Amino acid sequence: MDPLGAAKPQWPWRRCLAALLFQLLVAVCFFSYLRVSRDDATGSPRPGLMAVEPVTGAPSGSSRQDTTPTRPTLLILLWTWPFHIPVALSRCSEMVPGAADCHITADRKVYPQADAVIVHHWDIMYNPKSRLPPSPRPQGQRWIWFNLEPPPNCQHLEALDRYFNLTMSYRSDSDIFTPYGWLEPWSGQPAHPPLNLSAKTELVAWAVSNWKLDSARVRYYQSLQAHLKVDVYGRSHKPLPKGTMMETLSRYKFYLAFENSLHPDYITEKLWRNALEAWAVPVVLGPSRSNYERFLPPDAFIHVDDFQSPKDLARYLQELDKDHARYLSYFRWRETLRPRSFSWALDFCKACWKLQQESRYQTMRSIAAWFT
């Protein structure tokens, strides 16, 4: 008997019950773990859970954080500097709207890693196969044929068959269009001061360095100057000291923007810089009037083809010299447009933008067949 007189508790059956409950709890946990593991392994969403978890840390009502991976910076190799002369480069995001920056360099050590190589035709024109980048070409690397010269000045094009993936030139049908100049719209305050007609003390100017007697432009000039005084600057003509060209040409009412080669879209700095930036009305000899009108208003220039002879053109220019209202009509387009001239940095950034937009890989079968 218990000395206190109380009966002993029945401990054995309680211990069995506790052990049974513990085993049941362990079994439930184990099977739950197996189910979760199976769901995670198969990737199927579990009931009541999101397949993609929301971004944490964003305040209520704010837009979700952009989780799109950023594009890698493209590496572009300039196989040579244009005409072997280094030029200043700029951030492409500041040069071309919508473009991301590219790393552009002329360091050939990066050739194996470069996404693209820009090859300036003039710099490899003589014996091109020995001057092109070496083989084997890195997988996926694109080569860009870059040229601003007309077909007669481009030799050995046939040696470039199947080497290049993209074209880059003044031709508007190039993969990368790099004209010598263009007009851009503007609004608000005038982008330029009003034309000071009293400063236009001279009539017609022409600056020319490549003087060939048998060329179309020299022959036309020789016929024109028989009826009209033309001041010619350049080699074997009036000197034009460096840094004074714009100041000198701005004194003239008209400028002869005569191209040295007559080919579609070949409209050079003779018009965009020498004439328009000097506020002289360009008298053009080059591609057709309709070709010029793709890039300029019809009343922004005078085309030699509009006249039956150089004598008729001379008479027309003399009439405009005396009729201020008609002369000033050639500047009306400047109320809404302004001229811009090319830069090497901008051209390279256009290539940067094109490479970002166009990922397909193509091969030019024949540069010569396309360009000439």
Curated annotation (Swiss-Prot):
Membrane-crossing residue ranges in chain numbering: 16-34
In this protein, the residues bearing a glycan are 165, 196
Q: Name one Pfam family in it.
A: Glyco_transf_10
Q: Annotated region Disordered: where?
A: 40-69
From the Swiss-Prot or TrEMBL record, state where the protein is found: Golgi apparatus, Golgi stack membrane
Pathway info: Protein modification; protein glycosylation
Which GO biological process entries does UniProt record here?
A: fucosylation; lipid metabolic process; oligosaccharide metabolic process; positive regulation of cell-cell adhesion; protein N-linked glycosylation; protein O-linked glycosylation; regulation of cell migration; regulation of cell population proliferation
Keywords recorded for this protein, A-Z: Glycoprotein, Glycosyltransferase, Golgi apparatus, Lipid metabolism, Membrane, Signal-anchor, Transferase, Transmembrane, Transmembrane helix
Top-level taxon of origin: Eukaryota
Q: What is its main location?
A: Golgi
Lumenal compartment segments: 35-372
Chain ranges on the Cytoplasmic side, renumbered to this chain: 1-15
Q: Name one GO cellular component term.
A: Golgi cisterna membrane
For membrane topology, the record states:
Single-pass type II membrane protein
Q: Name one GO molecular function term.
A: 4-galactosyl-N-acetylglucosaminide 3-alpha-L-fucosyltransferase activity
Q: Which reaction does it catalyse?
A: a beta-D-galactosyl-(1->3)-N-acetyl-beta-D-glucosaminyl derivative + GDP-beta-L-fucose = a beta-D-galactosyl-(1->3)-[alpha-L-fucosyl-(1->4)]-N-acetyl-beta-D-glucosaminyl derivative + GDP + H(+); an N-acetyl-alpha-neuraminyl-(2->3)-beta-D-galactosyl-(1->4)-N-acetyl-beta-D-glucosaminyl derivative + GDP-beta-L-fucose = an alpha-Neu5Ac-(2->3)-beta-D-Gal-(1->4)-[alpha-L-Fuc-(1->3)]-beta-D-GlcNAc derivative + GDP + H(+); a beta-D-galactosyl-(1->4)-N-acetyl-beta-D-glucosaminyl derivative + GDP-beta-L-fucose = a beta-D-galactosyl-(1->4)-[alpha-L-fucosyl-(1->3)]-N-acetyl-beta-D-glucosaminyl derivative + GDP + H(+); an alpha-Neu5Ac-(2->3)-beta-D-Gal-(1->4)-beta-D-GlcNAc-(1->3)-beta-D-Gal-(1->4)-[alpha-L-Fuc-(1->3)]-beta-D-GlcNAc derivative + GDP-beta-L-fucose = an alpha-Neu5Ac-(2->3)-beta-D-Gal-(1->4)-[alpha-L-Fuc-(1->3)]-beta-D-GlcNAc-(1->3)-beta-D-Gal-(1->4)-[alpha-L-Fuc-(1->3)]-beta-D-GlcNAc derivative + GDP + H(+)
Question: What's noted about post-translational modification?
Answer: Glycosylated.
EC numbers = 2.4.1.65, 2.4.1.152, 2.4.1.-
> Which principal EC class is assigned to this enzyme?
transferase
Q: Which PANTHER family did the record assign? A: 3-GALACTOSYL-N-ACETYLGLUCOSAMINIDE 4-ALPHA-L-FUCOSYLTRANSFERASE FUT3 (PTHR11929:SF165), ALPHA- 1,3 -FUCOSYLTRANSFERASE (PTHR11929)
Family, according to the entry, reads as follows: Belongs to the glycosyltransferase 10 family.
Give the protein's biological function: Catalyzes the transfer of L-fucose, from a guanosine diphosphate-beta-L-fucose, to both the subterminal N-acetyl glucosamine (GlcNAc) of type 1 chain (beta-D-Gal-(1->3)-beta-D-GlcNAc) glycolipids and oligosaccharides via an alpha(1,4) linkage, and the subterminal glucose (Glc) or GlcNAc of type 2 chain (beta-D-Gal-(1->4)-beta-D-GlcNAc) oligosaccharides via an alpha(1,3) linkage, independently of the presence of terminal alpha-L-fucosyl-(1,2) moieties on the terminal galactose of these acceptors and participates in the blood groups Lewis determination and expression of Lewis a (Le(a)), lewis b (Le(b)), Lewis x/SSEA-1 (Le(x)) and lewis y (Le(y)) antigens.
Name of the protein in question = 3-galactosyl-N-acetylglucosaminide 4-alpha-L-fucosyltransferase FUT3
Gene designation per UniProt: FUT3
